[in-house]
A protein has these predicted regions:
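Glycine- and other small-residue-rich loops at beta-strand/loop junctions that grip anionic moieties
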Residues: 185, 374-375, 409
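C-terminal structural cap/anchor segments
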Residues: 394-398, 402-454
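A short, conserved beta-strand element enriched in hydrophobic/aromatic residues
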Residues: 291, 372-373
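N-terminal localization/anchoring segments of enzymes in phospholipid and broader phosphate metabolism
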Residues: 1-356, 360, 364, 404, ...
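Helical hairpin unit composed of two closely spaced alpha helices linked by a short loop
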Residues: 375-396, 401, 406
Length: 518
């Protein structure tokens, strides 16, 4: 297992944690104030009490009729019925955010300008369907729902370690001639990003356009508040996704979890790792950090370019200009085999595209389904799909962390073990440390690699991206990585699914009830 530098003990983050704590405390105080105010009204005035009960009943009906996942609806109905005042208040805060609607309109407007630049001829998709109708339908869903085209002229390389991927990124960045786009959930201004930053600064001096886009919450414990100012002084354009403010606005719950690097529109990177030291085992608070990534070279990079521009322009409603400067009009011939389709999900979408991709893949499996994920907090639909696959004889295996980064979330993940184990799903825990890669491999020919965890946050609440691959040579490398994990990890005994005590059942039931909100 390669190391990038000296392993350090976990240190206190001094940078912007104070701002995050201030915002959290301010929001909690506001919610408590609203709750006490409404509680006072309902206790002091009969009309207010009646109105609150009627509103709660109406809200329950509204939640029930909402086009959403059943588990999420059930959790909200329980909260509203058990705690009418607080439940109604929280629900309105989460789903009544005007900014969410504004963001949806911005993304739709930007997409209307961007996506016509992608090849929507369906010729490659038609060819794929002739070769394999079932797999072709997987790609067809993404073309029909998200307008994401499938490509052939793309070379794909899989990196089984984040540190190897970072080295490849550094090399690609150093060769940039026109532009560099980077979008990440978390950036830490220390050793690993320091290497990137030095190259970016040099490239700006050479006349290369550099844009950096990152999520505020994901990076808040990693970078200094003056980070943006420093980047812009160097000539690096920098934008922050959904900056947190000390005001009640539950769109803060929707974060940008995408991870994209694009160089000159010809080379693109994505995968599970952010640009922070712990992802490259420079800093190891949770044992060995296991993460993966991929590099695309060729036509499929066009989709990654547009995904970056989508978020860049949607965040501040800026005009879209000069797209042909970023999308090559003529492509070189690459040694790309198989089919490649980059895609993305946004919580403003009408369809749960991220979950649907995984469900479609699992339901089409005839031999094997291999999954890596840091979290296992799944819907009833996903749980049923995994169980049904195992019961029809498919070899279903899931690899999770051996050392979790969040003990409470890990306890919820383990609450799903009994049902899956009883159905024949094999579960592994990565003994050396924290499993952070997000991969799904079906029948050794179809794979998805990207940023999407098997939890509600990725499947419903976050902005995510991934790449769907079919018969790409790199799938052999992905399969080898899985088999190495199976040898390294510890398999959970099937007995874990039997003989649970009443207390354990009650605890797991309570955890599962709140799981959709996490």
């Amino acid at each position: 297992m390669p190391k990038r530098g000296k392993v350090l003990h976990k240190e206190d983050r001094k940078n912007s944690v104070g701002r995050l704590l201030f915002v959290i405390v301010a929001v909690i105080i506001q919610i408590i104030w609203f709750w006490f105010f409404l509680y006072y009204l309902t206790e002091s005035y009969l009309w207010a009490s009646i109105f609150a009960k009627v509103l709660a009943a109406v809200m329950v009906l509204g939640v029930f009729s909402k086009r959403s996942n059943a588990s999420i609806k059930m959790t909200w109905i329980f909260i509203i019925m058990a705690f009418p005042i607080l439940g109604v208040l929280l629900y309105l805060l989460v789903y009544g955010s005007g900014f969410t609607k504004t963001m949806r309109k911005r993304i739709e407007a930007v997409d209307a300008m961007l996506f016509p630049y992608l090849d929507q001829s369906h010729l490659i998709l038609d060819q794929l369907k002739k070769e394999n109708k079932v797999v072709g339908n997987q790609f067809s869903y993404l073309e029909n729902t998200g307008k994401f085209p499938v490509y052939r002229n793309t070379e794909v390389v899989f990196y089984k370690e984040a540190s190897i991927g970072l080295d490849a990124q550094l090399e690609a960045l150093s060769e940039a001639k026109k532009f560099i786009f980077m979008e990440y959930h978390a950036i830490e201004d220390r050793q690993s990003f320091g290497e990137i930053k030095a190259i970016l600064r040099k490239k700006v001096e050479e006349g290369v356009e550099v844009r950096l886009f990152y999520d505020d919450v994901g990076s808040i414990g990693f970078i200094d508040p003056k980070f943006v100012q420093e980047m812009e002084e160097w000539g690096i354009q920098c934008r922050i996704f959904n900056p947190i403010v000390p005001m009640v606005n539950l769109f803060m719950n929707n974060r940008d979890h995408r991870k994209i690097t694009v160089v000159d529109g010809q080379v693109g990177f994505t995968g599970g790792y952010n640009l922070a030291d712990e992802y490259f085992n420079i800093h190891s608070p949770y044992g060995y950090w296991k993460d993966t990534g991929i590099r695309l070279r060729g036509e499929a990079v066009g989709t990654l370019t547009l995904l970056f521009l989508e978020m860049w322009h949607a965040m501040d409603d800026s005009p879209v200009r000069g797209l042909y400067n970023y999308l090559p009009r003529h492509w070189e011939r690459y040694n790309g085999q198989g089919y490649c389709l980059p895609y993305a999900y946004a919580p403003t979408d009408d369809m749960p595209l991220a979950e649907d991709v995984y469900l479609n893949m699992i339901q089409s499996a005839t031999e094997s389904v291999y999954i890596t994920t840091p979290y296992l907090i799944i819907t009833d639909e996903m749980s049923r799909a995994l169980c049904l696959a195992a019961k029809r004889g498919v070899d279903v295996r899931i690899v999770l962390p051996g050392i979790p980064d969040k003990a409470f979330v890990f306890a919820i993940s383990r609450s799903y073990y009994p049902q899956l184990l009883r159905a024949g799903v094999r579960i592994y825990e990565y003994t050396p440390g924290f499993m952070h890669s997000k991969q799904l491999l079906v029948d050794h020919v179809l794979a998805a690699v990207g940023t999407i965890n098997m939890d509600y946050r990725s499947l419903y609440h976050h902005f995510e991206n991934g790449v769907l691959l079919y018969e790409s040579p790199c799938i052999f490398d992905i399969a080898d990585d899985f088999y190495e994990l199976f040898r390294t990890a510890t398999e959970v005994s099937p007995d874990k699914g039997h003989n649970r005590s009443l207390f354990t059942r009650m605890k797991q039931g309570a955890l599962r009830l709140i799981a959709p909100l996490l």
